[in-house]
Amino acid sequence: SAEMQAKSNPGDKKSTPKNPGKWLDIASLIPREVRHAFPEVLTWLPQDALLTKADIAAAKKMGVELSADDDNTIYIPLVDRRPAGTGLIFAANYQGKDFFLLMTTDKKLNISSVSVLHADKVPSAKGLKIYNQFAGQAVNKVSISAKTPLEKAVQLAVKRAGMLLYVRLKGA
């Protein structure tokens, strides 16, 4: 059909073969916060990070406990068809309450930034100064000296997220 060839959406009256819209644009599947972290990037490769038993065992050998609960999606920005880094949204847990962080890395998997994405259940997580301390560290060698229980929760979450990136992308 004409809709199929033009990649228009037959379920949307505004999407016609002459004006299909962006409904098939892969960038629309990338969270806004991740896209904003790489503003120059137009092409993305979302990659499911489903941990295998080998991944979990490799992480454990490096001192990090991962489980199937850590499965996630890694957002890989592409520049000239090559990976330019990664973006990962992940949960941290403090006193039984989840809050969400965004980690970005460069193409060598060194942390560029860690920031709070959503912390309504743990508002005190928003004002921590600890996030800047991760910048420049390799994802598989995260270390800081956390002083408070909340900082320790952030450190553990970043360490686990970093290891997830490492075992899935480096094949540790």
Task: Report each predicted region and the residues it spans.
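Intrinsically disordered terminal and processing segments
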Residues: 2-100, 106-172
